[in-house]
Regions:
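Solvent-exposed coil/turn segments that connect beta secondary-structure elements
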Residues: 36-38, 49-51, 75-76, 110-112, ...
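N- or domain-start disorder-to-order transition segments that initiate the globular core
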Residues: 2-42
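His/Glu-based metal-binding/catalytic segments typifying zinc-dependent metallopeptidases
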Residues: 29, 34-52, 61-63, 231-290, ...
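Structural motif
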Residues: 57-58, 149-155, 269-275
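Charge-rich, well-structured scaffold segments of protease-associated domains
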Residues: 1-8, 24, 82-232, 299-435
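Residues that act as N-cap/strand-start positions at coil-to-secondary-structure junctions
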Residues: 15-17, 88, 244
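M16/MPP (pitrilysin/insulinase) zinc-metallopeptidase core fold and M16-derived inactive scaffolds
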Residues: 43-108, 151, 286-302, 313
């Protein structure tokens, strides 16, 4: 036995992901049903396409996130504690969150409590009262969280990096400032909810232990009063060119290390070469066998933590390489990250490295499908990013069929280092260097 050589990968066993069936409620809500009787649990994901952070008024940044968080803070018939207690009695939970473009109501329950859970979902969705005392508590908690975040170099780097990518576009907003949080209260939360939480173009996914013929009438009755046309056009698409390229220093005196973020805009998730680009970026910077890990960390010791990934928005993507490094290694780390991107573009990708990355990505995808909630989240992503419903069913085969040339071509098209924004949070003395 040679312990220096890892055992060969086992062959991938076929695993067919079921497709949901599509229905439409009388009020126009699209419902995707995915029955799965293996466990007595039901998962819900309700995606609302025009209620995310990008729809904040510039003077009221943070309103969309607060609206989502506080929808479960009280209704005319339930307090926040009663909502949480009732969901707990049903063996589940309920909450609402906002991302960049969309808001999502997430709920789960034991299938024995499906009917009362649909009523609880409807109450939280349709009748939030935004009690002033709960709003005040949320504001205080948010202020405390913001003050903590602004002491952390990773947050400061991402905040500046968003501006470098998107300029004045709403996607650049990462978090509110303290003054913005004081400008709105319960009335503004109610107005945002009334304007943005509409059934038109909303999609509700239900996965788990239920009979669709029984569930659909329950949902139709519970959501019957939810009416309203589409509220607005989607947020304008951002320019496809990175707003500010080159070195950008965020001074943080007395820092013993620097936080680096490098990257540029790239096509959205539903672009034709998106999967090839995901493969290239995973090979570059995902996991302990990626090129950035093996060179920047293992070979040169410039950083303990280093990696690369793609962030996706509705109509654009962003390539991000990130590292934390000692101040004296800052410029060397940036140069080495750029060098690895150049190598990815210019040198052929070895077959074994390509296959190892494909296996890694397929394996992570399969792990995400183990739980019912994971399957529900996959289809939620398909809804948010405009992917075909069979995308995740085809994903392993599509990924396995990609060639090294396709991955390299996507990298060459979208990852040109001279177009990168380079954001560094660290010592003011770092300045700009030739990197």
């Amino acid at each position: 036995m040679n312990r220096a050589t890892p055992p060969p990968d086992l062959p991938m066993r076929p695993s067919q992901l079921p497709l949901p069936d599509a229905h439409t409620l009388p009020n126009g809500v699209r419902v995707l049903t995915l029955p799965d009787r293996r466990a007595p649990v039901v998962e819900f994901r309700l995606v609302l396409p025009f209620a995310g952070r990008a729809y904040d008024d510039p003077d009221w940044v943070g309103l969309a996130s607060a609206t989502a968080r506080l929808m479960s803070a009280g209704t005319p018939t339930r307090t926040s504690f009663e909502i949480a207690d009732e969901a707990d009695r049903y063996g589940g939970s309920i909450g609402v969150s906002a991302n960049t473009e969309t808001a999502t109501l997430t709920a789960r329950c034991l299938s024995a409590y499906l009917e009362p859970m649909t009523r609880l979902i409807a109450d939280v969705l349709l009748h939030p009262t935004f009690p002033p005392d709960e709003v005040a508590i949320d504001r205080a908690n948010t202020l405390q969280r913001l003050r903590l975040q602004r002491s952390q170099p990773g947050f400061l780097a991402e905040e500046r990096f968003r501006v470098a990518l998107f300029g004045a576009h709403p996607y650049a907003r990462l978090a509110p400032d303290e003054n913005a949080l004081q400008r709105w209260g319960a009335d503004e939360l109610q107005a945002f909810h009334a304007a943005r939480y509409r059934p038109a173009e909303a999609t509700l996914l239900a996965a788990g232990d239920f009979d669709p013929d029984a569930l659909l009438p329950l949902l139709g009755d519970a959501l019957a009063e939810w009416q309203g046309a589409a509220v607005a056009e989607p947020v304008p698409a951002p320019p496809m060119q990175t707003a500010e390229t080159g070195w950008q220093l965020v001074p943080r005196p007395n820092s013993v290390q620097s936080h680096l973020m490098l990257g540029a805009l790239c096509p959205p998730r539903n672009a034709p070469d998106s999967l090839a680009l995901q493969l290239a970026v995973s090979l570059l910077g995902s996991g302990a066998s990626s090129r950035l890990f093996l060179t920047v960390r293992e070979q040169y010791g410039y950083a303990y933590s280093v990696g690369a990934h793609l962030d996706y928005y509705l109509r654009v993507g962003a390539f991000v390489a990130e590292a934390q490094t000692a101040t004296e290694n800052t410029h060397d780390a940036v140069r080495q990250i750029r060098a690895e991107v150049e190598r990815l573009i210019n040198e052929p990708i070895p077959t074994d490295e390509l296959q190892a990355t494909q296996n890694y990505m397929i394996g992570r995808h399969m792990l995400g499908r183990i739980t019912l909630g994971g399957v529900a989240d996959l289809y939620k992503q398909a809804v948010i990013y405009g992917l075909p419903l069979d995308y995740w069913q085809r994903y392993p085969d599509m990924l396995a069929s990609l060639t090294a040339q396709q991955a390299q071509a996507a990298a060459a098209q979208h990852l040109q280092p001279d177009r990168f924004a380079v954001v560094v949070v660290g010592e003011p003395s770092l300045g700009e260097a030739s990197v």
